[in-house]
Amino acid sequence: MNAQNTIQTLTMTSFKGTVLVAGATGKTGVWIVNRLQSHHIDYHLFVRSGAKALELFGPEIIDNLTIGSIEHPEEIRAALRHADAVICAIGGNVTDPASPPPSAIDRDGVKRLAQLAKEHGIKHFILISSLAVTRTDHPFNKYGQVLTMKLEGENEVRRLYSEPGFSYTILRPGGLIDGPPLMHSMIFDTGDKIETGAIRRSDVAEVAVISLFIPEAHNLTFELIEGKNSPQSSLVQFFQQVN
């Protein structure tokens, strides 16, 4: 079977189990829930604000919700009891001085979630990071060294989930913008070589979700931005760019 046929076959497959979404009430997190629903994949949400989750997702979410903080291990453990995989979409708010710094969320929060997920036996961990995390002189690093903190979180995920029997996927999207998914081609690359670019949150969410069941996405760190205006039936085929 050639690579194209393999990709086509994989589009008929889906993930069996429940996905814990950390950061589900953020703009990207909301789209992750939407795309999980589109793929008929069960999910459980780990959120700081139950009221916001109910506002965004409606009262039917109440049985699929754990309220807690990424800074509190016992609350994370309570959420992980419902999970077979994790999609982590947490991120510090660098524009709000009252919010925890990137070191607490993008580094320590990601590390804590990954460590506890592995202890719980979660086999696959998906992290949404950022373009340019290896560039210490990037202007964004003026805000609490946010890119460096994200890279340190990434490094812990790779360290933990590179062991046999486990796997990870780390997405490094470009600048996040709004809009519906599947309206553009994608550009994937590795090695943090993409200088700049934008991508819809909805497409980041779609790529994160299909990474649950696409073997080509496992044990992969890659950058992604949108390409040409070109409606897509699936984004699976773009993994051929990095495999």
Predicted regions and their residues:
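N-terminal Rossmann NAD(P)H-binding glycine-rich loop of SDR-like oxidoreductase domains
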Residues: L10-I41, F46-V47
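Active-site-lining helix/loop region of Rossmann-like oxidoreductase modules
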Residues: A24, L176-N243
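NAD(P)H-binding glycine-rich loop region in Rossmannoid oxidoreductase-like domains
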Residues: V19, D42-R112, L116-E119, L212-F213
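Eukaryotic N-terminal low-complexity, Ser/Thr- and Lys/Arg-rich leader segments
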Residues: M1-G17, C88, S234-N243
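Short beta-strand/turn micro-motifs composed of small residues
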Residues: G23, V47, S129, R172, ...
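Hydrophobic/aromatic beta-strand patches that form the interior of the parallel beta-sheet core
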Residues: H44, T66, I87, I126, ...
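Short, well-ordered alpha-helices that flank and scaffold nucleotide-derived cofactor binding pockets
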Residues: V30, N34-S38, Q115, E119, ...
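Glycine-/Pro-rich loop/turn segments that contact NAD(P) or position catalytic residues
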Residues: G92-T190
